[in-house]
Amino acid sequence: MESALSRTPATGPKAGSGLRDPALYLNRELSWLDFNERVLELAEDPAQPVLERLKFLSIFTSNLDEFFMVRVAGVQEKIESRSDRCGPDGLSPTHLMDAIAATVRALDRRHARQLSEVLTPTLSHAGIRIVGCAQSGIPADTFERYFREHIFPTLTPLAIGPGRPFPYISNLSLSLLVHLRDRGGDAEMYARVKVPKEVLPRFVTIEPGTFIPLEDLIAHHLEALFPGTEVISHSLFRVTRDADFEVSDEADDLLAAVESELRRRRFGEVVRLEVGSGADPGMRARLVEWLDVAPNQVFDVDGLLDLSDLRQVAEIDGHAELRQQPWTPQTHPAFRPLVTEAGEQPDIFAAMRESEILVHYPYQSFSSSVERLVLQAAEDPDVLAIKVTVYRTSDDSALVPALISAAEAGKQAVCMVELKARFSERQNIRWSRELEEVGAHVVHGVPGLKTHAKTILVVRREHKEVRHYVMIGTGNFHAKNARLYEDFGFFTTSREIGQEVNNLFNSLTGYAHPQREPKVLTAPDAMRGPLLELIDRTIAAHRAGAPARIRLKMNALVDPACIRALYRASQAGVPIELNVRGICCLRPGVPGVSETITVVSIVGRFLEHSRVFSFQLGAERAMYIGSADLMPRNLDARVELMVPIEREDLRAELDDTLDRCFADDTNAWTLQPDGRWERRRGGTRSVHDELMARALTAAGSTDLD
C-alpha cells in the first residue's frame, strides 16, 4: 500500500535547510499506520497458522481503535482550533487527516477481504464456521428460543423522533439503526438498538464450532422488539470517540480528578463513524447528520464491524494444529532452586548477591524472577522496605498483593502508581485504594510528568549493613503481557545503582529534584543530553580511526534532536543499525545524510518491546537498557530510567540478541529511503524461534512443548 505523502524520493536536504528539511522526516501518524499494516501482513501471511492469522486481524482492529481515540483525536483537535502548525515532516493537520483517511480506507478493505475471502473459508474447512443465521443451517426455532431466553432481555430499543432526540452512543459500542413504518399508517420512524456485546459474547455458539455474530441474531428478530411496526431496513454502525484527556496537576485530589475525567471520556467528540457497507444511503446520511461528522470521518466497512472480537474465535478450545506451538517461559538458570525438593523456592537474594542477572521475557520467566523478588521480599523479616513503580499491571499479578502483605507485616511499602497511564487508569485507581487501606505509602508522581520508569527497590538489613536489591526493566510489571511482550529485566545489588534508584524514588515521593547521576540515565532532566553526548563521542571515535558503531533497539524513533544527531553520525561515516518496531520518523539511505543507517522492524509472534542502546566508542563500550523510547514525550514529559550494562557476559547476551534481530529474514521489514517498508522474504531465520531455542539451551532443555 502506498501513500503519496510518505513515499517520496530520497534526496538530500534543500540548500540552506540543513538537517531540519521536512523531506528528511517521515510523518509520525503515517508511520504508525505503516506499523499496523505490518500487523495486517501477518494476518495475510499463509505461512502463519490460521488461528494466529485471525488473532492478528483482531490486534489490527484494536490497534486502529486506539489510534483513532488518541492520535486522530489530537489531529482533529488541531483542525478545529484552526492550528496550521506542522510537524518536522511539514504536513499540515488538514492534509494529514486526509492522508490518514485515505490510508485507513485502503487498509480496511484489505482487512475485510482477508476475513471474508481467505480466513473464513479456511476456517470452515477446519470445522470452524463464522456465519450468519441464514447460512448456519440451524433451525429457525432454535434461534428463536435462544433469542427469547438469552438476548431479548438485555435489549433496549430507543426511539428517535419528535421529543426523542438521537441517543448518546458510547465509545466503540456496536449499534443497529432501524428504519420502521407504522403498520396502521404511513408514518416512518427510526430507532437505535445497542448490540450488548459488553454483557454477551459477540459470537454466539449455539452449536459447537459455529460462531454467529450477535448483531445478526438481533437483526433476524427485530420485529419482536417493535410489535405493530414494519421493519423497512436496518444498518450496523459503530462510533469511536476522543478518549484522550488531561488532568490538571494542580488538582487537590489527583485520584478524584482522574475518576472525573474517566467519566467525561465517555462523552468525547466523535472521531470516526463506521457504517456497514450495505447501509441504505438515507440511513447513512441521517447518521452523519445526527453525529455531526465530516466526510473524512466516515468509513464504510465491508462485512463485519469491529473485528477485535475475533479474538473470541481465535481462542476456541482445541485445534492445536491451527496454532503456533505453545511456549513456556523458562526459569533463568540463576533463579533455579539449589535444592530440588518439592516446593523448594530459590533464594533470589542469594542469586543477586552472586552476580548481576539479565532476564529476557517472554523467553525466560517473569513469575520466577520479578514476582519472586517481591514475594520473597514481602515474606523476609530482614527486609525493611519495598519500593515499586506501577505503570500497568494485571489482575493476576502477584506484585500488588505482595506489597499489601508487606505493608500488613509492618514493612515500608512504597508504590508509585501512575494514575494517568492511558486505558489503565481504573485498575490503577483500584490498586491505589487497596494499598492505601493497608497503610502502604502510595504516591502518584511528579506534577506535569507521567512516571514510566520500571523499577523495584528492596532494602534489606544484612548483619550490620543495609543492602539495596534493584530490578530495572524495559517493560511493565504485567504478568499476562510478560508472556507476550519481549522485554529485559536487570537485577543488581550494585551500591551505586541502588543509591541512584533510591534518589529517583525520593524525587517521586518528596521534594528532591531529579539530578544527573553517575550511572543511570533519568528523563526528563538527564537522558536526551547524555545520549546526544554518546552519539557525538561515537562520531569523534570514528573520525580518530577507532572502532565506532551505534546499535539501537526501541519501539519508536520520533525525537527530532536524536534523529538529527544520528544523521550527523551517518554523515561522519558511523555505521548505524536501528531496530524500531513501530513508528520511525528517520529516513534512512538518503544520499549525503543517512547512507550508513539501516532500519529494521520485527513484527511477529511476540511484541518487540525492549529498549537497548549500544555505542562503540573506540576501545570503550556504552550499553543501556530501560523504559524510554526516543520520543519527545519520553524524553521531556515522562520520568524514565535507563541503566548501564557493564558486565561483559551480559553485554554479549544483548549483542547476540541484536545480531539475531538484524539477521531475521522471516519476521523483519526494512525501511527504504522512500519511506516504504519492504518485508524480507524467503528466509529461514526467526529471532523469536532462535531466542526460544537459546532459552531452552540455557535451561538445559530442548523441548519446545
State the predicted function of each range:
Residues 575-579:
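Hydrophobic alpha/beta core scaffold segments
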